[in-house]
């Protein structure tokens, strides 16, 4: 099949959507499908063979995040020349909405992915009054697609309750070869200042408001107070706009920055307890 993927984020971006799409595209190509990725970027041209950069702007409050701009004419021009068998739209930006419109105009089948609970982000960024409007926008856009795929049955039921139609579950997996307890590294734990019997609590992910990180690190602080004789250490893996404020609020924590691949797997394996407090996930990658 000839498949075009439209997305605001893709590898080497570090987030759940980019990670999921990288695996999806790689798996489809391994099976012989022709996959082309049309991705938001602030630069023109192509990244790699099989990728096209599309116009975008950085999100004002979060410059690492790119928002794709409406590009219906570019989509129509490409798809009239190289008609895909199906278009997969992964993000609901103006670019994503214009891709749905262009595909429907040309009668090209459209599948959307529901990767992010953007409507739930509203309260984290002080726009609670816009949550209903965000849900309405997402529902209207997704219901224009032939199908919306979601990562879990729970997510399917939630969206169905909000009026989303034609939902199907496309599950996720974990690379059990990469993320293996055998990668536990005593020297890494020592570099964190951990004694042999101390318990390492870990937080991994984007350091942003919607991840509820203050709750996770606050729990660790509470445990320290309630069990002062128990050795423990807090390790934070990731980067994002809250890095500096979290460093100030939790000076005893070890901040490791962004990690990838085998290095990330070593960090996971060196932890004893993972704290994951986000309430906005569709599927925590």
What are these regions (language model features)?
Residues 1-55:
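N-terminal subdomain of nucleotide-sugar transferases
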Residues 21, 28, 201, 216-220, ...:
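A structural motif in glycosyltransferase catalytic domains
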Residues 75-96, 100, 106-111:
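Short N-terminal targeting/anchoring amphipathic segment
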Residues 227, 243-263, 273:
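Nucleotide-activated donor-binding/catalytic signature segment of Leloir-type glycosyltransferases, i.e.
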Residues 104, 114, 118-147:
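A conserved, positively charged/aromatic
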Residues 39, 53, 131, 135-185, ...:
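Donor nucleotide-sugar binding/catalytic pocket of nucleotide-sugar-dependent glycosyltransferases
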Residues 194-222:
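Conserved donor-binding/catalytic core segment of Leloir-type glycosyltransferases
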Residues 279:
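Aromatic "clamp/platform" in nucleotide-sugar-dependent glycosyltransferases that forms part
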């Amino acid at each position: 099949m000839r498949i075009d993927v439209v997305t605001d984020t893709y590898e080497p971006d570090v987030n759940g959507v980019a990670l999921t799409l990288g695996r999806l595209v790689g798996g489809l190509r391994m099976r012989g499908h022709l996959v082309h990725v049309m991705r938001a970027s602030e630069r023109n041209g192509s990244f790699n063979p099989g990728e096209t950069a599309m116009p975008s702007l950085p999100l004002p409050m979060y410059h690492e995040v790119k928002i794709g701009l409406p590009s219906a004419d570019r989509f129509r021009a490409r798809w009239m020349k190289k008609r895909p068998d199906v278009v997969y739209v992964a993000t609901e930006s103006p670019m994503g909405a214009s891709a749905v419109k262009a595909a429907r105009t040309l009668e090209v089948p459209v599948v959307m992915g529901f990767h992010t609970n953007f409507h739930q982000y509203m309260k984290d960024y002080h726009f609670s009054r816009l949550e209903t409007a965000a849900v309405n926008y997402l529902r209207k856009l997704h219901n224009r697609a032939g199908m919306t795929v979601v990562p879990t049955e729970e997510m399917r039921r939630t969206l169905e309750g909000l009026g989303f139609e034609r939902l199907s579950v496309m599950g996720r997996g974990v690379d059990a070869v990469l993320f293996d307890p055998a990668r536990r590294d005593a020297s890494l734990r020592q570099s964190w200042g951990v004694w042999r019997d101390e318990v390492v609590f870990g937080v991994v992910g984007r350091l942003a408001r919607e991840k509820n990180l203050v709750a996770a690190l606050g729990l660790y602080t509470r445990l320290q107070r309630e069990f002062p004789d128990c050795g423990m250490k807090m390790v934070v893996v990731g980067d994002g706009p809250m890095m500096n404020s979290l460093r100030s609020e939790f000076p005893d924590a070890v901040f490791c920055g962004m990690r990838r691949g085998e290095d990330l797997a070593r960090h996971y394996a060196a932890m004893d307890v993972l704290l994951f407090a986000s309430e906005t996930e569709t599927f925590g990658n």
